[in-house]
Amino acid sequence: MRTKLTLVGAGPGDPDLITLKGIKAIRSADVILYDALVSPELLEYNDCAIKVFVGKRAGKHSKKQSEINDMIIYYAFKYGHVVRLKGGDPFVFAHGKEELDYAESFGIDTSVVPGISSFQLPGLYSYPLTHRGISQSFTVVTATGSDGKISEDLQNSISSKSTLVILMGMRKLSGIMQLFKNADRKDLPVAIIINGSLPDAQVISGRVRDIEEKLNAEPTLNGPGIIVAGESLSTHSDYQRVLKSWLKTA
């Protein structure tokens, strides 16, 4: 029996945003180990496979990473083809490489199917990460370092002209906005995307100075979110409407 591990990026949530190659991998799996943010609809592509939930979300882990690694080995040698179905992309703020290396150390064949990462969600709502004459680059950064504090990479990016896409930062939103204010960037456009790509997705746009107030005015908001900050957002229709309204009253 051939043993194999395929890491599959399930995308940001909408089941239609998985790749065709990802669907083919799911259909060929003997066992599927899937994350919390994976759409249940994706599991329906394979009625015969063993399906095991190993999700992690908001600090609540059903399994430790070491346990997941061992489960990959166990199921591969017992059944054959294991698909590790991971939210977003397996190699973007995930343990994809760790799982891949661990499987290979046991002589298991491996392959990777990339997925759409949540950092690409701004485009789904017409927020450009780059724009000619405004922003020539974008930076994707996690909000939290290994010490639980705001990451050093994020702190070093606050003054950059690059558009910032901040993942796993909702719990530190106030501290992050204060960093921008300390850098005299209170007017910088900011957008928050919660449950991006899902039917209940909510998008809040504002600026550093008022984004927290706008967020607090929406008490029903719940779910994983990303923070986007940069001048390129000013080209979005939300900001253009505000600008035109301001010009009329000025």
Q: Which functions belong to the PLM regions below?
A:
Residues 39-42, 119, 173-174:
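Short, well-ordered alpha-helical microsegments
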